[in-house]
């Protein structure tokens, strides 16, 4: 044994050839700060071996290196800029020394090589991969950019266009694509990986392969003519501006850095990468996006822990087969859980099957599946007008009309047709689960399972625990939701549960702004362009359906009369009474016409202004700051109340529900992350300016206490140790 660290070791394989093996405790390898330091020590040992002829890098895990240890990021990002820059220089010196070894090097890459894992193998001369490879640089999705030389080596290896596509979008690619663009040199079966890598290494040692020529381009300026450079970088900057926008500085920073570094050799190019990385790491956007990643891991880990002792449902059923029911059936069948789809008439069944078939055909058109797979999936969806097959199902989700009497009747009838251990769930969006449970003989087998539309796109499923829902019931539906590829978050019961409960105060803030003379077009523009929502409140109401919102608003007002009962006729009332229901009938805040792809396209409609004039004061202008404050304060206050009341368990789950269920701007990280970034004291000062607007603007006492003590909702993060302690030399 030449060297043994906590996460890697170095040993001789055969005469003159050494292997460096990543083998961290636990299930995966991560390139954390300790591993970078250990890698530097191992390379130091290699540099002393006069008889070294070649080096093989490999992993003892199912994946090569899954990336950096993102749990370290928030503390690293708090390190002062100069110290963070020093540590990056040290880390890059390690990879440079790997790249500069006076012998050929090869990485045998299995499974994932992402982020720092990808940057590590870019420093070797050759890369041989297994068919299950996923390799790439996802850093821009975390609000940063590659910091271990990825923005320097990848463009010089692949050419600017291919590298920019991966780096700016934070993409990873599979084995075939990696081979095609030159990111790996070959793909072999897993059992042949080391043997194949050794064969390449021997050819390089024997002079049959020119490893020095392979290495040289990574040390030099990027080989691009002025015209080629102008075209590549101009197109890339345009694409990034269009897709990422101003709220996500990392992608455009990465492109500009690669452009600036193009004319330099490795050392100066790495300095430019360092100078770009460090300021990005200190942005609120990076903290928010890293926070989302960590919250996502936490939520998924919680679901995994919850379901460890239950069997995932093997057969499901859906009651009510409109667009929503068809979407749920498709998602279940697509993820290998056969589903019975029941309705009371053929027309609805046809609509549900058509929705499922449409979604499968889209997969076919995109080349994700072939005709055989399509036929196989569709054959596992069984439409029926009766309860045939219900005696075999493990879980049933009801998705009928949002009417408590209808839902109770359907659920009570279904309970008599299923096994005693079958779980029933309702896809209600607002009706309390404990109220629906009153119609059942086995309320312990019943809970809420709130999917979001469109089902195939929206990652969140709210799992609602009623007063009598058993732990096993909750675990079973969490297991089914996870199997469907969704992110389940368990909440406690109340009108609207969590997501709709906090959404309707936001809509109430919108209604009050319109009542006070604001223009809905400006509100939408501010909330989209400035705050960052995917759609403004008027457009969102049109998509949700004005009639749906009108009904849900009444349910919420009955549930929380002190805050959500309004004493005036608002814009939603006016549009509802005028039969303007949004996209579903082509008339809402906007008029809708189908574009060439059959999608609704919004257009101005002067008739709306006349309708709104009946329920509004004369038009007046509001500042962007006032619009954002008046829209967001009611939502954030309600989010805090939900945490204080135990409707949602943690700030992490609340923020993920908002991001995954409502499209809360990821660069803000969710309501609690936004609140922490703003500061509770500053938020309180802002909210108190608007408390005259009514109870929705009254800050909860718990938040007032946070403001008094200047406490955050997320646990404070300590800066990483001084860089000297991180072994920088």
Swiss-Prot record:
SUPFAM superfamilies: 6-phosphogluconate dehydrogenase C-terminal domain-like, ClpP/crotonase, NAD(P)-binding Rossmann-fold domains. Residues 1-189 are annotated as: Enoyl-CoA hydratase/isomerase. Pathway: Lipid metabolism; fatty acid beta-oxidation. GO terms for biological process: fatty acid beta-oxidation. It comes from the Bacteria. The keyword Transmembrane helix does not apply. NAD(+) binds at residues 324, 343, 400-402, 407, 429, 453. GO terms for cellular component: fatty acid beta-oxidation multienzyme complex. GO terms for molecular function: 3-hydroxybutyryl-CoA epimerase activity; delta(3)-delta(2)-enoyl-CoA isomerase activity; enoyl-CoA hydratase activity; long-chain-3-hydroxyacyl-CoA dehydrogenase activity; NAD+ binding. CDD domains: crotonase-like. Its EC number is 4.2.1.17, 5.1.2.3, 5.3.3.8, 1.1.1.35. It holds the Pfam family ECH_1. In the N-terminal section; belongs to the enoyl-CoA hydratase/isomerase family. In the C-terminal section; belongs to the 3-hydroxyacyl-CoA dehydrogenase family. Involved in the aerobic and anaerobic degradation of long-chain fatty acids via beta-oxidation cycle. Catalyzes the formation of 3-oxoacyl-CoA from enoyl-CoA via L-3-hydroxyacyl-CoA. It can also use D-3-hydroxyacyl-CoA and cis-3-enoyl-CoA as substrate. This is Fatty acid oxidation complex subunit alpha.
């Amino acid at each position: 044994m030449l060297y043994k660290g906590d996460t890697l070791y170095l040993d001789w394989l055969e005469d003159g050839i050494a292997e460096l093996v990543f083998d961290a405790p636990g299930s995966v390898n991560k390139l954390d700060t300790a591993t970078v330091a250990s890698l530097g020590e191992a390379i130091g040992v290699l540099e002393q071996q006069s008889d070294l002829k070649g080096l093989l890098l490999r992993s003892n895990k199912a994946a090569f290196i899954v990336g950096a240890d993102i749990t370290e990021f928030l503390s690293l990002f708090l390190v002062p800029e100069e110290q963070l820059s020093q540590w990056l220089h040290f880390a890059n010196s390690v990879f440079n020394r790997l790249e500069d070894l006076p012998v050929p090097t090869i990485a045998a890459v299995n499974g994932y090589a992402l982020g720092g894992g990808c940057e590590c193998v870019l420093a070797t001369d050759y890369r041989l991969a297994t068919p299950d490879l996923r390799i790439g640089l996802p850093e821009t999705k975390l609000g940063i950019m590659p910091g271990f030389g990825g923005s320097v080596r990848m463009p010089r290896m692949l050419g600017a266009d291919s590298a920019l596509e991966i780096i700016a979008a934070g993409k990873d690619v599979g084995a075939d694509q990696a081979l095609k663009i030159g990111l790996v040199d070959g793909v072999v079966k897993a059992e042949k990986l080391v043997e194949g890598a050794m064969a390449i290494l021997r050819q390089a040692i024997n002079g049959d392969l020119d490893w020095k020529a392979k290495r040289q381009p990574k040390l030099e300026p990027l080989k691009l003519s002025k015209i080629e450079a102008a075209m590549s970088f101009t197109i890339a900057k345009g694409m990034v501006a269009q897709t990422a926008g101003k709220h996500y500085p990392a992608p455009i920073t990465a492109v500009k850095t690669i452009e600036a570094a193009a004319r330099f050799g490795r050392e100066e190019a790495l300095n430019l990468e360092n100078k770009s990385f460090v300021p990005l790491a200190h942005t609120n956007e990076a903290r928010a996006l890293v926070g989302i990643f960590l919250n996502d891991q936490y939520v998924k880990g919680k679901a995994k822990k919850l379901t460890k002792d239950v069997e995932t449902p093997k057969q499901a059923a859906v009651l009510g087969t409109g667009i929503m029911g068809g979407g749920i059936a498709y998602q279940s069948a697509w993820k290998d859980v056969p589903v019975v789809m029941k309705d009371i008439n053929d027309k609805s069944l046809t609509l549900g099957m058509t929705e499922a078939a449409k979604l499968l055909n889209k997969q076919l058109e995109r080349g994700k599946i072939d005709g055989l797979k399509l036929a196989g999936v569709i054959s596992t969806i069984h439409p029926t007008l009766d309860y045939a097959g219900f005696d075999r199902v493990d879980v049933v989700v009801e998705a009928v009309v949002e009417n408590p009497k209808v839902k109770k009747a359907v659920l009570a009838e279904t309970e008599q047709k299923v096994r005693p251990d079958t779980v029933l769930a309702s896809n209600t969006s607002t009706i309390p689960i404990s109220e629906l449970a009153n119609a059942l003989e086995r309320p312990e087998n019943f809970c809420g399972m709130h999917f979001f539309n469109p089902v195939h796109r929206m990652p969140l499923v709210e799992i609602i625990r009623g007063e009598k829902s058993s732990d096993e019931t909750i675990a079973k539906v969490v297991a089914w939701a996870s199997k469907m590829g969704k992110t389940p978050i368990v909440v406690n019961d109340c009108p609207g549960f969590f997501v709709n409960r906090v959404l309707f105060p936001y809509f109430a803030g919108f209604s009050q702004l319109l009542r006070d003379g604001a223009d809905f077009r400006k509100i939408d523009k501010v909330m989209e362009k400035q705050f960052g929502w995917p759609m403004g409140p008027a457009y969102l109401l049109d998509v949700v359906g004005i009639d749906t919102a009108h009904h849900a608003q009444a349910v919420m007002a009955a549930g929380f009369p002190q805050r959500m009962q309004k004493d005036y006729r608002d814009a939603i009332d006016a549009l509802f009474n005028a039969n303007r229901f949004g996209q579903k009938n082509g008339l809402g805040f906007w008029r809708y016409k189908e574009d060439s792809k059959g999608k609704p396209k919004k257009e101005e409609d002067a008739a709306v202004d006349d309708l709104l004039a009946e329920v509004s004061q004369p038009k007046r202008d509001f500042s962007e700051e006032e619009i954002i404050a008046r829209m967001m304060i009611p939502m954030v206050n309600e989010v805090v109340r939900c945490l204080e009341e135990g409707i949602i368990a943690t700030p992490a789950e609340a923020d993920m529900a908002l991001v995954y269920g409502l499209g809360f701007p990821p660069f803000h990280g969710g309501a609690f992350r936004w609140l922490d970034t703003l500061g509770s004291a500053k938020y309180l000062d802002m909210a108190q300016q608007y408390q005259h607007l009514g109870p929705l603007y009254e800050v909860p006492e718990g938040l007032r206490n946070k403001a008094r003590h200047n406490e955050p909702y997320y646990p404070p993060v300590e800066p990483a140790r001084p860089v000297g302690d991180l072994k920088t030399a």
